[in-house]
Amino acid sequence: MAKFVLNQNLPDLGGPPLYPGPTGSARSPSSPYSVETPYGFHLDLDFLKYVEEIERGPASRRTPGPPHARRPRASRTGLAGARSPGAWTSSESLASDDGGASGALSPGAFPGLSLPPLSPRSLSRNPRVEHTLLETSRRLEQAQARERALSPARAVTRSPRGSGRSSPAPNPALASPGPAQLQLVREQMAAALRRLRELEDQARALPELQEQVRALRAEKARLLAGRVQPEQEVEIEARPDKLAQLRRLTERLATSDRGVRSRASPRAEDPDGLAARRSEGALQVLDPGSRTPDGEPRTRETGTEVVPETREVDAQAVPETGEAGVEVVPETVEVDTWVTEELLGLPEAAERELELLRTSLEHQRGVSELLRGRLRELEEAHEAAVTRPQSRDVAAQTTLGCTEKTTQTELPVENQPRPTAGDEMAPVGILKSIMKKKDGIPGAQSSQGPKSLQFVGVLNGEYESSSSEDGNSDDEDGVAEHPRSSSSGSDDSSGGSDAGTPGPHNDKDAGDCELETHPELTAGREGRCELNPRLREACIALNQQLNRPRGVTSRDGNAARLVAQEWFRVSSQKRSQAESVAGVLRGVKSLGPELLAYVVNLADGNGNTALHYSVSHGNLAISSLLLDTGVCDVNHQNRAGYSALMLAALTSVGQEEEDMAVAQRLFSMGDVNAKASQTGQTALMLAISHGHQDMVAALLECGADVNVQDADGATALMCASEYGRLDTVQLLLAQPGCDLTILDNEGTSALAIALEAEQDEVAALLHAHLTSNHQGQSSTGSPTAKECNDK
């Protein structure tokens, strides 16, 4: 608000320089920058422009631009003091809005000021002055109209005070407010502006809240759409209760909203006693029905009076909305629990595992169907054999005893000639072989799988390898624990004892005895190729694929898969017979050397070959047959990083000279210093850690290096010292080049490891050996020094 105060430093307003005379003034009457008024005064046009800017109020002050220079107010003060109440009725339009200057510029403010006589020229009308005054009045009315439109509160406050144009002079009865009241009004207006800014900030946050509400509604719709399940009927039965609960929540929210509006309806009155009541249109803004679909108020042009009320009620209603949202959360969570894994999708690993299981089941179904067909054929053959004349029963029984060893051939009935009695009774032997398959010896893939390499798992951190018959074997590879970390490694479990019993199965019956009494039949069987027609056809197809330049491809996998299944079934079971393996090897060798090398070195999903399985099961006779082929890869490592040579170091052959000969032959054909891919251990370290003294001696005879270090920097001597194997330590110390000063990755020697493990005997032996070595070096060094001195 502009407030004009009389400046006491102005010159005398009644002096001669303000009136035109013969001597002239600072400005000439004809100057284009001044206008002569009807009272004979000259008004500066710049001063009139300055007055107009003051009258326009805050709108003009907010306009950017360079500030105007303030001119002296002498002419306006002189004009206000010299005018008469009735001469110029629109003189108050040039006063300020608060009316404070009108009292200071009233005619009675300067009683001693005498007016000069009016000149004849002052009585004449000046069109330029009238045009200027009319333009000023028009602009003032426009500014006041705009201000009333933008701020109704200020317009209501200003409404009791007249503009001055409706009355010729101010009424002394209506006294203008004092400076204290005006200052209080200004403070209230400043507080209202600050509150308005705060509410505007809150209004800016409304779109974000509305966006969150829309997102929650979309999420709720998505969850409701995903509830299409077989138990949807139960959901429909429980839906009325939920709808009733939602209705109750809605009623509570509406009640709280009405309470908030009723609490927010009163409004403080201003100091002038004028209460700014809220209009009905402002209340409609709070009604949810009066909002647009986006949530914005429909009447945003209601001015500053409506905006504070709307924002204030929203700010108070936010906690209620948050409370309702918290109560609705359990419903959303309950809907989320109805989403099953079918809608979310299974992980890729689970899908792959399910696919492998499906493939395995399909394969087992096919094998079962094949076995059922063979069983039906053999039952028919058995019935035919039973109905034979009694005179042939004796020969049939004798032939049965002789041909029981040929049950693994599985020759079909229709392909066997039937001229002799022995050939007629061949189906009976085949029937017995199929019954063994039903018990789980050759064909039960699920029962024999986990037993493969079982003792290796017990002795080496539960390493397990699945059966070779299962094309989709588990990927449990790797030794979980370092052998040095388990002190119980020397104690063989049941799996180890099973592996330690070499040789074929001891379950011999009368048929085996009769087989030994008929050498001519055995010789005749050995000359035959032990391949059934189905396996023979697959081997021929596989041999043709191997002879091609591109080799075996993925599209040619049927023959290779069949050969692998039959090969592992015959050679890699715990009860596999060396005779059957020998027959298959002869049949494969007759088809070609490339096929023989391919079949002997076939590996399953875990990287285990027939040599791995035969060594781990203790079937060293089969291992000898595989080594006799001359194409067996002895150094092939499985996925756990172990070769058949390393597995042989874990077995215990006892007093069996033949098995020890096979083990020594295996050690001599392979690399005894090869390291496991995961732990870096050698066969010597494995044999020492499991307490197989005979294998340690055999490895040392084959040239095993005692100073080789594993991934942790440990040597074979450190392993023996840690486990307290005194005999092994003596055997290692007897080897030439055994270094006791080697340190592992932690900077520990074999002597320190023995002391830490409280192996006193081993520590004493190592200390004595170190002392003897130092004394020997010193004794051999002194004569050399003496000879040097003599020379």
Curated annotation (Swiss-Prot):
GO terms for cellular component: cytoplasm. It holds the Pfam family Ank_2. Residues 105-125, 158-180, 485-496 have a biased composition (Low complexity). Residues 1-37, 56-181, 254-312, 401-425, 463-514, 772-791 are annotated as: Disordered. SMART domains: ANK. Residues 180-229 form a coiled coil. Residues 25-34, 401-410, 772-783 have a biased composition (Polar residues). ANK repeats lie at residues 606-636, 640-677, 679-708, 712-742, 746-775. Keywords: ANK repeat, Coiled coil, Phosphoprotein, Repeat. The keyword Acetylation does not apply. This is KN motif and ankyrin repeat domain-containing protein 3. It comes from Mus musculus (Mouse). InterPro entries: Ankyrin_rpt, Ankyrin_rpt-contain_sf, KANK1-4, KN_motif.
